[in-house]
Amino acid sequence: GVPQQLVDRYGRTVRDLRLSITDRCNLRCTYCMPAQGLQWLPTPDLLTTAELTRLGRIAVERLGVERIRLTGGEPLMRRDLEEIVEALSALRTSAGAKPDIALTTNGLGLEKRAAGLRAAGLDRVNISIDSLDPQDYAAITRRDRLADVLTGIAGAQEAGLDPIKVNAVAVPATVEERAPRLLAECLRRGWQLRFIEHMPLGPRETWSSQDVVGVDQILEVLREAGFTLTEVGRPDRRPAALWRVAAGSALGQEHPAGTVGVIASVTAPFCSDCDRTRITAD
């Protein structure tokens, strides 16, 4: 039969489901978590593979969801991730299509699992990296693991999980230095960079509107560094507004053409046409 649609009271139809499959993480990013003393959910409280599959089945077969994104915590911390991906990939929409399955990850351990995840039906990955400078990365994440993340990305590319999208949180102290370097490096490596405005997450009382580097400021920093940007807009109601970057030179180095995105959830919220919903790990 024709699926029912999941429509909220504002008339927004849900097409995109975010499944958080764990609250655990192996990094301790300063804007997200305290350095220590975190209480994780007891394992029996986390949704099981069967429960996640059942939720996915209802969403895809009966409610018209077309895209599923697995998030955490860090989803690679679940040993049954391949099983979860395989079960969700086997679902079919009412039109007979496989749902698009994506993973948001910090990339640690991805090199060992990328091929298996691809074989299980994973379509693409978003990797969270706020800096490609090892010391800077260690200061942000409180873990010296950048080399492992880069190995993880190489594994994902080898497995055919292209294009690689990189998510970076923009914070005021370092945006002028960090953002242009990160964009130049991502363009050279063929990765699609998305800056994310710093949202009120993480330890209580640690967020203030002073911490937000808005989309206009990010663009200004990039243009001042020498990048030529042309607005593309927000394709398919996705959260990221995109700009085309012309090939040229910035920071004294050549770079190829590409795109850069900004997810401006604080300064330019896109709630009115949002088509996603989230289920937490418990």
Where are these regions (language model features)?
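Residue-level recognition of specific faces of alpha-helices
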Residues: T13, R18, Y31, R67-R69, ...
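Accessory C-terminal segments flanking Radical SAM cores
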Residues: L201-D282
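Conserved beta-strand segments that form the floor/walls of ligand-binding pockets within enzyme
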Residues: D16, S20, R69, A102-T104, ...
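Radical SAM/AdoMet-radical enzyme domain recognition
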Residues: L46-T49, T53-R69, R78-I196
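Canonical Radical SAM [4Fe-4S] cluster-binding loop centered on the CxxxCxxC motif
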Residues: Y10-T49
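N-terminal [4Fe-4S]-dependent radical SAM core
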Residues: G1-R18, R28-T30, E61-L63, L242, ...
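A short acidic, helix-capping loop that chelates divalent metal ions and anchors anionic groups
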Residues: G37-P42, D133-I140, G202-T206
